Amino acid sequence: MGKRDRVDRDKKKSKKRQYEEEEEDEDDAPGNESQEAVPSAAGKQVDESSTKVDEYGAKDYRQQMPLKGDHTSRPLWVAPDGHIFLEAFSPVYKYAQDFLVAIAEPVCRPTHVHEYKLTAYSLYAAVSVGLQTSDITEYLRKLSKTGVPDGIIQFIKLCTVSYGKVKLVLKHNRYFVESSHPDVIQHLLQDPVIRECRLRNAEGEATELITETFTSKSAISKTVEGSGGASTSQGVDAQAKSDIPKDLFDFYEQMDKDEEEEEETQTVSFEVKQEMIEELQKRCICLEYPLLAEYDFRNDSLNPDINIDLKPTAVLRPYQEKSLRKMFGNGRARSGVIVLPCGAGKSLVGVTAACTVRKRCLVLGNSAVSVEQWKAQFKMWSTIDDSQICRFTSDAKDKPIGCSIAISTYSMLGHTTKRSWEAERVMEWLKTQEWGLMILDEVHTIPAKMFRRVLTIVQAHCKLGLTATLVREDDKIVDLNFLIGPKLYEANWMELQNNGYIAKVQCAEVWCPMSPEFYREYVAIKTKKRILLYTMNPNKFRACQFLIKFHERRNDKIIVFADNVFALKEYAIRLNKPYIYGPTSQGERMQILQNFKHNPKINTIFISKVGDTSFDLPEANVLIQISSHGGSRRQEAQRLGRVLRAKKGMVAEEYNAFFYSLVSQDTQEMAYSTKRQRFLVDQGYSFKVITKLAGMEEEELAFSTKEEQQQLLQKVLAATDLDAEEEVVAGEFGSRSGQASRRFGTMSSLSGADDTVYMEYHSSRNKASTKHVHPLFKRFRK
């Protein structure tokens, strides 16, 4: 009986250990499950009960989806389960893609056929940018090769019938509930809670309903014509027109006219009490009429305009302009999220939004480096004076008096423990300001509870979230829909690559065989030290060294990523390269990065997970990954983004950037690697598997002898379980440093003999090494 209990305990430990290794760093701590109120329709799924399934599990839609006579000219298949398939080779692909990005979530976008999925949140986003229920169903019917299933029509109506019909608008610093549907306003006013929120005059009577005519015209003027995606009126030549059904072509002509024309809408509104806004929002959600927040910044006379404009040199690319038109489509500022690939110019989108609103702006990033980069971006693209920009980080606390643009980090605002006197004064100032725009960089990294704390500390009329990867390994990404707003725009990575807006990257997975000694220990050890064994695999080290030598001879700029600090230091020191990790000071970080950018002698740097986001290194064109965080899809995409910026002078080659992921064969790392690649594969990237690096035997590389490999193994075995853990970045949300944890240890650890290894060295060799000056210090420029 005792033996069985022991086996059960070992199984539980193994499962727990596996869970901890796979776990994502963005997860909230236990007990943070409090959810924002969401409409019940948001939980609905498309009904698939009538779909036939054959003996192999394949779905048979032939009876439900008869083809139209001219189906070859139409680009869409709409399946009864909500999945939509788009032919990328269709002459009307541009039109159909613009529409699908607005109403559905991209699932997979390879070369020829793209897959999308209708969800409640994607339909909410469609309504928020002005599409009506009838528009969505009519567009789908005209684009589809078959009839649109009745279940899909019902699902669209269910999700869009009430969303977007009621708006919360701030005008002249007074809040109004506004709708173009008078019957909806009357329905809301019948509710006692909403009647209580309505503003009353001095006599205690409710204020009158206000009827006005609202002219909607985009606040972003079209400056780019016919250049790949800014308008639906481009991209179809005369020959292709003959292949398009007449009803489809006429419909698109009408779409273009509707987009260009000013639209007059009659609205009905009533004023509400400012102190009851939160209660009003919750009640409207319960009534299935969630409020859509809009900021009428042009008519906000109480908040002063700031002196900021785009410089004449700032030219928006078509996709950047398109994303901003979604945000400012009706002359007001909508809150929401814009998704653009790393290196595609998210910062310029944020700066342009601030220049359009022209009210006080708060920018939040996730590190002190990103704060410095945002300041540089504002000075590069806008006419803002340096004295108008205020930074608030642990290292830099500028005086906020008279500033118009404040830049800080999430951890600085979400900090709950005692602050210094100076920091407390700045926080008080941030809290008392009424911000016109809040820009939230890398918005996917913020857990819901932390986010809610940041949102309650500062008040902003409009919130713009920017990210490259709207994915998380938990389900908390949907919280952003109601904490910030719907997704306004998402770009196609492959399309931007083909148009030259981002680099063309060759992705490769390099398989490194485990040396016999290392693999023997890997199989025997059951603690977290296994991670250290497959990361410090001598063959992986040799592959990394070979790739660095190969690309340095080509004058490439190389970044090597390692999540494990022990491995990071070992690799960097052995290869004589500079490295950046958590404890590296801000000054030293900037010095290393500046040398990497401008010093021709520094072509390789090692970075821990602190460099996953917000490190702006446009010169880098080679990335080597030696260790990573489990199966995180987000981290893989963020790291690829470090080399995605468009490269100058490298157009002749087929590929002008390289992404290598080094994986130890026959270990857990291979399973993690497959999981990590899912997001990039869905974006259209393919990974080349390299089992042998040509020319590696001819190079002089480290750990080429059994003795050297044995010494490395002894060093790894002498390391603690703490060394095997990943770096915990200060201020990173989701870090579990505050929780109790259990680690396996030995008696030698308790006696202080943890790092002791018996090794012999020749005395004369030691004396010679003391006189040697490290060449790295000669190469660095101060």
Curated annotation (Swiss-Prot):
GO cellular component: nucleotide-excision repair factor 3 complex; transcription factor TFIID complex; transcription factor TFIIH core complex; transcription factor TFIIH holo complex; transcription preinitiation complex
CDD domains: DEXHc_XPB, SF2_C_XPB
Annotated Helicase C-terminal domain residues: 543-703
Modified residues (Phosphoserine): S34, S686, S751
Acidic residues bias locations: 20-30
PTM comment: Phosphorylation on Ser-751 by CK2 controls the 5'-excision activity of ERCC1-XPF endonuclease; phosphorylated protein inhibits the excision activity and thus NER. Dephosphorylation reactivates the 5'-excision step. Phosphorylation has no effect on transcription or the 3'-5' helicase activity.
Bias (Basic and acidic residues): 1-11
Enzyme class, UniProt record, top EC level: isomerase
Residue numbers covered by motif Nuclear localization signal: 6-18
GO biological process, one term: transcription-coupled nucleotide-excision repair
Regulation: Phosphorylation on Ser-751 by CK2 controls the 5'-excision activity of ERCC1-XPF endonuclease; phosphorylated protein inhibits the excision activity and thus NER. ATPase activity is stimulated by TFIIH subunit p52 (GTF2H4). DNA translocase activity by this subunit in TFIIH is stimulated by XPA, ERCC5/XPG and XFP plus ERCC1.
Main location per the UniProt record: nucleus
EC number(s) per entry: 5.6.2.4
Catalytic activity: Couples ATP hydrolysis with the unwinding of duplex DNA by translocating in the 3'-5' direction; ATP + H2O = ADP + phosphate + H(+)
Binding partners and assembly: Component of the 7-subunit TFIIH core complex composed of XPB/ERCC3, XPD/ERCC2, GTF2H1, GTF2H2, GTF2H3, GTF2H4 and GTF2H5, which is active in NER. The core complex associates with the 3-subunit CDK-activating kinase (CAK) module composed of CCNH/cyclin H, CDK7 and MNAT1 to form the 10-subunit holoenzyme (holo-TFIIH) active in transcription. Interacts with PUF60. Interacts with ATF7IP. Interacts with KAT2A; leading to KAT2A recruitment to promoters and acetylation of histones.
UniProt protein name: General transcription and DNA repair factor IIH helicase/translocase subunit XPB
Lineage of source species: Eukaryota, Metazoa, Chordata, Craniata, Vertebrata
